[in-house]
A protein has these predicted regions:
Chain B
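Basic, polyanion-binding surface patches
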Residues: 86
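Short, conserved catalytic or interaction motifs in soluble domains
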Residues: 61, 81
């Protein structure tokens, strides 16, 4: 491994648990522990732990903090009440998706943006540019290295957290965040995740991460790597930036327009209002294979031997026991039931468009 | 740990000569461990003629696609149909239930070009 690779505070913990480490977005991260499919099943059935400390954590503070975020994040940030979080896209003046992430409203004039590891530098530069040009009364503070982040996901997670932290607010509903004590350590906790299960994301000080991780492991949570995280998010129909969308994709093509507030003044408003009124020619769809075969990023989608799209994500879903994928296709092929063919390294394999998500948990 | 009743290739296939002279072929425990969870296997049709080291199929794990090569020249007499529905057998039992093809009309002299169990284990040790 080159010396420029970053390690999270849990690196040694991963090695001791037999994690298979791989380079990812400049970090050495565990791809898997016991195995990708077993980890995926554990999260769906009980609970799993993910080190997501590689993700960017940028605090935005000051009188213009919400105005800056509102200028580029597609969700309505100034409309948030304290202790709530909102998913959104960071869009540019052309309406392209620079990144996606969650904005947490922590306290008066204090917000936290959690963004993708691969985009952390680009997001930082973009926010700094906005601060310098229009929102000078804002302080940006990248605390990725000082604060850890652990995702604790699965149907058992809520009961376990209530036991571990008596001061966990009973009202900590989805997309709420709060500061709690776990074994005397102050931890920022949010009811968010990237798996399609109920669960939490915990942000302790980096040097307390290993103790929190160990405490959660003792409750029976299974350590999970990036492999299971990717399977889980795909089953839940959650897009991955850089794979399923990028700066050349707009939220309408990505099927994420429900997260776009068009009415507010913003850097993207003019571009995306035009997209909204004109419509798009291609759009992301979910699909499942009608024959055996693993669709993968970059494979061509065909109909009547004509290229009509491209696969962006795909794989075997252990939860559904079928092969599923995401891809961009001509608009008319996004209707559920539409048939097309995926070219799997020369093998023409039948597929059918399906509505997203592929999997949604029972709520109760 | 590798059974010494068979020979191994440097591409991590094993071949077991059966009492009737036919050859059973699969991938090694090391190979399945490196691949991770296998989710799809494509095997040749019965009757296919294969030359030693020729590509005979593909195995896909969650993360990657790998080619399968035949360690011996021969004719595909049978493929393990159970793998089509249960590719995880390759992870669970690579040296037995996870066998892939049965070859007839093999050239037994080619076995000399393959590794014994102890030679294969030394080869793995060199890989680190």
């Amino acid at each position: 491994m080159s010396q420029s690779m970053s390690r999270t505070a849990l690196y040694d913990t991963h090695l001791s648990l037999g994690g298979r480490m791989v380079p990812f977005a400049g970090w050495e991260m565990p791809l898997q522990f016991q195995g990708i499919l077993a980890e995926t099943r554990a999260v769906r059935a009980h609970s799993g732990l993910f080190d997501v400390s590689h993700m960017g954590r940028i605090w935005v503070r000051g009188r213009q903090a919400s105005a800056l975020l509102d200028w580029t994040a597609t969700g309505n940030i100034s409309g948030l009440t304290q202790g709530r979080a909102r998913y959104g896209l960071l869009c540019t003046h052309e309406g392209g998706i620079l990144d996606d992430g969650i904005v947490y409203y922590l306290g008066p004039e204090e917000y936290l943006l959690v963004c993708n590891a691969s985009n952390r530098d680009a997001v930082w530069r973009w926010l700094a540019e906005l601060r310098d040009s229009r929102f000078q009364d804002t302080e940006l503070d990248d605390r990725t290295m000082e604060v850890g982040m652990i995702a604790f996901q699965g149907p058992d997670a809520h009961a376990v957290m209530e036991r571990l932290s008596p001061d966990l607010p009973g009202s900590l509903r989805p997309f709420r965040c709060a500061s709690i004590q776990v074994d005397g350590v102050t931890v920022l906790i949010a009811r968010t995740g990237y798996t399609g299960e109920d669960g939490f994301e915990l942000m302790p000080p980096a040097d307390a991460s290993a103790d929190i991780w160990k405490r959660l492991l003792e409750t029976g949570a299974v350590p999970c790597g990036l492999g299971a995280r990717d399977v889980l998010r795909l089953e839940a129909g959650l897009l991955l930036h850089g794979t399923d969308m990028n700066i050349r994709t707009n939220p309408y093509e990505a099927g994420l327009d429900r997260f776009v507030a068009l009415e507010k003044e913003s850097v993207y408003a003019a571009a995306l209002r035009q997209v909204a009124s004109q419509g798009v020619g291609r759009k992301l769809t979910g699909f499942r294979m009608l024959e055996r075969g693993v669709p993968r990023h970059g494979y061509t989608i065909l109909q009547d031997n004509l290229e009509v799209g491209e696969v962006t994500s795909g794989g075997y879903s252990p939860t559904l026991d079928s092969y599923i994928g995401l891809g961009y296709v001509a608009m008319e092929l996004t209707a559920p039931g539409s048939r097309f063919v995926v070219d799997i390294r020369g093998r023409q394999t039948e597929a059918e468009a399906v509505a997203l998500p592929f999997y949604s948990r029972r709520r109760g | 740990m590798y059974p010494d009743n068979r020979r191994y290739s440097r591409e991590h296939e094993w071949v077991l000569i059966e009492s009737d002279g036919r050859a059973l072929v699969g991938i090694t425990d090391y190979a399945q461990e490196q691949l991770g969870d296998v989710v799809f296997v494509e095997l040749p049709e019965a009757g296919t003629q294969l030359d030693q080291s020729q590509k005979m199929g593909e195995v896909e794990s969650v993360k990657a696609v790998s080619d399968l090569f035949t360690p011996l020249t021969g004719e595909v007499a049978e493929v393990n149909q159970a793998l089509v529905d249960h590719p995880e057998l390759i992870n669970d039992d690579p040296h037995d239930k996870g066998w892939m093809v049965r070859l007839a009309s093999v050239d037994a002299t080619q076995l000399d070009s393959l590794l014994s169990a102890s030679e294969y284990e030394s080869f793995l040790a060199e890989l680190g």
